[in-house]
């Protein structure tokens, strides 16, 4: 299941969500994944399902200021959630994050994802380490999950 999501129109092409490579600043391109995740989630909750590239980049930049990464990136999911909630309240929306620091089993993780998606909520996920080869390039990375198969 995947819910209707936002589309970023950049150079007459549609993109499903943002890309940290769009940041003009090199550091943001390297370490701005939490900012892109937050911008993706904000678009969903604000019902901005079609957004221009300049507007999305502006939102990414706002989120970068809220979630400025340090030398190790931004591996602080409680702080991420607090900052996101604060931003949403500032624009008049109330969200309540649900935290799952560690799952006891893969099945528990799948259940968490499916439940959130089925209830219409995107998931901001931070993967610091993982044993799965398929996720090798995605460690120490934040992403927005909007569906499952």
Give the role of each language-model region.
Residues 1-79:
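Active-site-adjacent structural segments surrounding the nucleophilic cysteine of cysteine proteases
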Residues 2-7, 60-149:
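Conserved active-site-adjacent core of cysteine acyl-enzyme catalytic domains
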């Amino acid at each position: 299941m995947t819910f209707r999501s936002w589309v970023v129109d950049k150079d007459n092409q549609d993109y499903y969500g943002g890309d940290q490579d769009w940041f003009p600043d090199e550091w943001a391109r390297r370490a701005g994944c939490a900012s892109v995740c937050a911008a993706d989630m904000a678009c969903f909750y604000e019902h901005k399902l079609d957004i221009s590239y300049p507007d999305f980049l502006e939102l990414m930049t706002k989120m970068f200021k809220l979630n400025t990464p340090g030398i190790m990136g931004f591996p602080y999911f409680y702080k991420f959630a607090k900052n996101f909630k604060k931003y949403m309240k500032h624009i008049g929306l109330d969200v309540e994050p649900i935290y799952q620091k560690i799952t006891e089993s893969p099945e528990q993780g799948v259940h968490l994802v499916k439940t959130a998606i089925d209830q219409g909520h995107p998931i901001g996920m931070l993967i610091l380490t993982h044993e799965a080869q398929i996720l090798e390039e995605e460690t120490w990375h934040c992403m927005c999950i909007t569906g499952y198969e």
